Amino acid sequence: RRTLQQYPVGGICQFGKNIESPSQLARFNKELQDASATPLFIAVDEEGGLVARLANNDAFALPRYASAAAVGASGDPEDARAMGQTIGAYLKEYGFNMDFAPDADVNTNPDNPIIGSRAFSSDAGTAAAMAAAAADGLRQNGILPTLKHFPGHGDTAEDSHTALAVTYKTQEELANCELLPFGADTGLHAVMVGHIAAPNVT
């Protein structure tokens, strides 16, 4: 509490180790917000599928999604919007106002060890439409979406948590594929930059 009063902290990210139970989480987020001298962004990684800190915690009886890819397979953005609405509703209930989702990557590299089914599609247009709809669903519940991982993690062969991920695409190639979901008319307010090197661009 003293730290939040003393320093102008702007945001908090809750990881799995911080999440024990529904009542604990709701209380913790409220205490953080109440203690802070500055209104906080309180965020979590809740993509649905493999990355879902709340839904994948057995202490929470929340809807679970197989993956973004499973949702994207329908080709109907309304399915992604419904996913965003569902996730947004329960994040709001537990005191979150920001989600580090949706994943806006285009899953073009079958050897990618970290994105895979976290992406809505291997088709850029489909990924863009789905990510935009999911983001809108989150916003409808007052949750700030964060499209990730700019400039595109889908065509890398490395897990950026353990090594430097590299895309060898040119700026033109990125613009025609990976960047499309980030340039779509999403009304987005936040983008997460990936730990990705682009030697043919920079």
Predicted feature residues:
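Mature N-terminal segment immediately following signal peptide/propeptide cleavage
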Residues: 1, 5
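Conserved, mostly hydrophobic/aromatic
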Residues: 12, 45, 91, 134, ...
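Short, well-ordered coil/turn segments that N-cap beta-strands
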Residues: 37-40, 96-97, 141-144, 184-190
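A non-catalytic, amphipathic alpha-helix used as a structural packing/dimerization or gating element
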Residues: 82-86, 129, 133, 176-181
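Loop-centered beta-sheet repeat module
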Residues: 124-154, 175
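Extracellular glycoside hydrolase catalytic/binding regions
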Residues: 167-175
